[in-house]
Every structure is written in structure tokens, then in C-alpha cells.
Amino acid sequence: MKFSRENMKWVFPEIKTTQNFLSPSSLPQEPPLSLRSSANFDLNSKISPSILLIIIILSIIFFISGLLHLLVRFLLTPSSRDREDYFDNVTALQGQLQQLFHLHDSGVDQSFIDTLPVFHYKSIIGLKNYPFDCAVCLCEFETEDKLRLLPKCSHAFHMDCIDTWLLSHSTCPLCRSSLLSDLSSHQDPRSSFLLVLESASDHSSREIGGDRDSAACVAANDDIDVSSAHLGLVGNNDLGSTRIDSGHGDQYLDGELGGSVGKVVPFSVKLGKFRNIDIGEGTSSNNNIGNSSSLDERRCFSMGSYEYIMDEETTLKVHVSTKKQSSKNRGLPGHRTAMSECGFDPTGRLKFSGSGSMRIVEEAAEKNVVERESFSVSKIWLRGKKEKHSKVQGKEDSSLVSSSSGRAFSFRLSNQRNHPDAMIESGCEEDNQKCENSESLETKTPSFARRTMLWLAGRQNKVVHSSSSTNV
């Protein structure tokens, strides 16, 4: 069967159209299984509006409560007087709870501890017949014991006990009040205590700044005494505390402990005693007033039934005298006394103000002799090889002469302490002799350039002499 060409053209386009219609790209594809499962999960896990509203309300409540907490903490803080009343009426349990928030306490420096007042127990005014107890070592105070007072809370302890305590704590062992004042921005500038700490190395550079700060504070409040040294603690008159300075300032010492006595400052002292809280007050007081052997026996038991009770009925005071500031200024670290401070005159006119200056001049003169000897010996390497042996021997003789003369000079100086004129003449003669010795040694020793020229000239002569000998 024969088909015409036109029929063939009509058949082939139909086949192409059917093939295009049945092609896999034109057929619709089903989505994969993972996409269908994720779409179903999104539809099922959609948050309802009620839950979203509850979350928003809770977040707003937490935000408002945080703002109220900050306002109460920073705007409604108690005043300094209320804080002092709180520390005065604080109980042992409250003090222990407060100590939990000061676990990272690293103590205070020994220089700060040394500035606290020290006195004898027998110097306290108003003592009763029975002795008080130390809250640190749990022992009774004796008449010859040295006590150290904390001016901020007026509590006193054994000197060794409180010193050991303060090296690892910056709070009082009884009331847990901090010895270092809170210098935050929200505190009243006219608070009862002011503490200024500076290192000893920076004292010379900050002394002027401390004086300016003290002048400004005195102008603001005449009742407050401000310390201008590198460590100062200023207290209120209610606690009997005044200025405590270290370094160049005054220190509180008892009149029996300090050598030079200055003004006497009264302090109020708060002491207590361990009493049994299980028994009645009268019976406990009678037991506590007994001999020390019974007290030592009961201290061996648990401290759960005993409490350190402050004696609020009696008013205890102690008068601590301040040590006078010495007229002589202490030398700063790394500072050495200059000859001008001892009255030294380079023209030869010496001034003496005491045995100390004589001793300093003597040491300076001996040091000068040693420096001249070392200067002359250090020029040995400048000498030539031919003259090395002879000049070294002569140099040793001259150094021996200079050292012996230096020893004679110091001997004459020690014998002539009471004759300044003779010592001045001997010192001038010794200086002239040393200058002449040094000048003579320098003239004998050629310069470096001259020795270099001589060495080159000698080498050239040697070369010429060797060439002439070979020619012969």
C-alpha cells in the first residue's frame, strides 16, 4: 500500500503531538514524602493565640517587677544614720547571714591595721569587778593585755587576735560591719566615715591632691575632719573617733605605750562577756563572775548554749593619746641623701649640724676615695704592651698609697670630730692630693688616638725593616 507524500506529512505531525502530550515532563509530579510530612507538622504545631497572649503577659509582669526591684534597691536605700542604728542593734544571727554575702573577703593591709588605736585594758574607764571576754579567742582580758579598738563600731579585742582576724577579713568579728567605708555614688558625702587609700609609692605624687580634697571637704562641712595623708579614717563624734593617719600622719597610741605624747582623744569602748542562755540571767552572771578555771571548763563545751552578750548598762571609755609627728621628714623609698642636704659646699667650706651629718660626710668622703681608685684602675687597658708591666706595678703602688691615705683620712676624721677646722683642712689636702695623683696618671697614660698612631708607625717601621733585611 502506497502512501502519498502529503499523507505522510499529515501522519508524522500527529505522532509528534501525541509524543509531546505523553512526555513525562508534562505530567504532574507528586510532592515527596518529606515535604508532605513537614507541612502536616507545621499545621499541627501552630501556636494558638491564647497561649501567645499568656506568654506576652508573663514577660510584661517580669519586666515590671525587675524595674520595681531596681527602684527599691537604688532609690529607697536607708540613710547612714539608719545604717548605724542597724549595726548597733544587729543580732548574732543577722551578722552571720550578712557574712554569707562577704565570702570573697581578702582582708586589709597591715599598714591599715597599724593605724587602729591600741591601749591597755587597765586604762579603760568604768570597768566592773568582773573581767570582760575577748570575742575572738574566748579568753578573759587581763590588766596588762593590749587591746586594739575598731573606731567604727567601738568593739575592742586582743591585739594579736584582731590583727590575725583582719589579715583575712575586713569586717568586725562581732557585728560584721565593714571597716572599709562604702564609697559608692549613692552614699551621702557627709557620712560618718571617710576612707582614703593610696599606695606608699604614690604618696609623693598624690600628696598635693589629698590636701586639695581635704580643703574642699572641710569647706563643705566643718564638723567633718578629713585626712590628707595616704591613709585616713575619719569618724563621728558619737563613736569617739577622729583622724587616723599612717605614713606621715599621727597614730593612736596609749599614753603608756607611746613615747612622745600628743593630744588625748576619748573613745567609747563596747565589751561583752559569754553567758549561758539556758540558765537564768542572775545564775549565769554569778557563774560567769566566778574563777577563770570554771570559765575555761565551760568553754570546752559546745558554744550552742552560750552567747556573747554586750554590757549596755556600763559606759566604757578610754583616752588614747596621739603620737607626735617627728620634725624630720622621712625619706621616700629610693631616695638617697644628697651632700647638699648635709651642708656640703663644693668650694671647700663645710657646714656641720650634728654627729649624723659628720658621719654622712665621712661616708661620702670614703666613697669618693673608692670611686677615684676605681677610675684610675679602669685605665689599665689603655696602656701599651711594652709599658704594661712597669706601669701596672707603679699603678698598684699608687693605688696602695691612695687607699692607705684614704684610711688615714677616715682615721683622722674620726679623731677630729670635735675639731671641724682641722678636719676641713685635712679634707682639702686629701682632695688636692687625689686630684694631683689622678692628673699625673692621666699625663703618663697616652690618649687612644696617640697610641693608635704610634702603633701604626711602629708597624710600618717593622715592615720596612723586614723588607730591607730580605734585600740584604
Curated annotation (Swiss-Prot):
Coiled-coil regions listed: none
Pfam family for this entry, one: zf-RING_2
Annotated membrane topology: Single-pass membrane protein
Subcellular location: Membrane
Zinc finger (RING-type): 134-176
UniProt pathway annotation: Protein modification; protein ubiquitination
Record-linked PANTHER family: E3 UBIQUITIN-PROTEIN LIGASE RNF13-LIKE, RING-H2 FINGER PROTEIN ATL13-RELATED
Domain description: The RING-type zinc finger domain mediates binding to an E2 ubiquitin-conjugating enzyme.
Record-given protein name: RING-H2 finger protein ATL13
Organism, scientific name: Arabidopsis thaliana
Gene designation per UniProt: ATL13
